[in-house]
């Protein structure tokens, strides 16, 4: 049975589970929405949705430095209480997220943050490529949905495959941690710094150097 993007998105809204988890749940349950919710609950992936409405205003700004100080990451993860912010599991989660960001280089936390013009530009590129295949318009739109979801999975932190466990997304990892800790959590923002990024390196004029050496 073919699972549509609309089905996946609807299940995601209801449960708060990751897109890949929602798609798997729908596939395993033959596209039945209610059974898919139960499937996610049995896996502990929908538990976080019950806590999603609670304010998460405490938390921690974590950091990770890699490659001899050439790559650095700051990430803010929020929780509900200062007590949980001091919890070892919470702090380990923050560190793991910072390490993932250093390795995977996401651009945004969630797809809602991606500028509309960037999405439209990507859609236009994918649509033109699909048209060249000569496929019917309906098929092209399905291909387009898949390509855009892949685009989001590449640049959005919550939809990326977790580098330490390729079987789950960061959203799944977050949901599991929420279920384990018992408080709502949110990855608010992050920044990645790469030494020298954006700076133009001065290139020496080899001919001038030779001439100068000869003249000495």
Swiss-Prot record:
It comes from the Bacteria. Residues 81-84 are annotated as: Involved in Mg(2+) ion dislocation from EF-Tu. Gene3D superfamilies: 1.10.286.20, DNA helicase RuvA subunit, C-terminal domain, Elongation factor Ts, dimerisation domain. It is found in: Cytoplasm. Keywords: Cytoplasm, Elongation factor, Protein biosynthesis. Its main location: cytoplasm. GO terms for cellular component: cytoplasm. The keyword Metal-binding does not apply. InterPro entries: EF-Ts_dimer_sf, Transl_elong_EFTs/EF1B, Transl_elong_EFTs/EF1B_dimer, Transl_elong_Ts_CS, UBA-like_sf. Signal peptide: none annotated. Pfam families: EF_TS. GO terms for molecular function: translation elongation factor activity. NCBIfam families: tsf. PANTHER family: ELONGATION FACTOR TS, ELONGATION FACTOR TS, MITOCHONDRIAL. Associates with the EF-Tu.GDP complex and induces the exchange of GDP to GTP. It remains bound to the aminoacyl-tRNA.EF-Tu.GTP complex up to the GTP hydrolysis stage on the ribosome. Belongs to the EF-Ts family. This is Elongation factor Ts. It comes from Geobacter sp. (strain M21).
């Amino acid at each position: 049975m073919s699972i549509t993007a609309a089905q996946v998105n609807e299940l995601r809204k209801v449960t708060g589970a990751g897109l890949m988890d929602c798609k798997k749940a729908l596939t395993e349950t033959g596209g039945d929405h209610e059974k898919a919710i139960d499937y996610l609950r049995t896996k502990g992936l929908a538990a976080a949705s019950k806590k999603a409405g609670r304010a998460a205003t405490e938390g921690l700004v974590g950091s990770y430095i890699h490659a001899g100080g050439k790559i650095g990451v700051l990430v803010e993860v929020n929780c509900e209480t200062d007590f949980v912010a001091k919890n070892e599991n919470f702090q380990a989660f923050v560190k793991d997220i910072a390490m993932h960001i250093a390795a995977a280089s996401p651009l945004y936390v969630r797809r809602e943050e991606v500028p509309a013009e960037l999405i439209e530009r990507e859609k236009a590129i994918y649509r033109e490529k699909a048209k060249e295949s000569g496929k019917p318009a309906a098929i092209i739109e399905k291909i387009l949905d898949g390509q855009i979801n892949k685009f989001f999975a590449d640049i959005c932190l919550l939809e990326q495959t977790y580098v330490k466990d390729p079987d789950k997304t960061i959203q799944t990892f977050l949901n599991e941690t929420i279920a384990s800790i018992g408080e709502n959590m949110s990855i608010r923002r992050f920044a990645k710094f790469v030494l020298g990024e954006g700076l133009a390196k001065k290139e020496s004029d080899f001919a001038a150097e030779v001439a100068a050496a000869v003249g000495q």
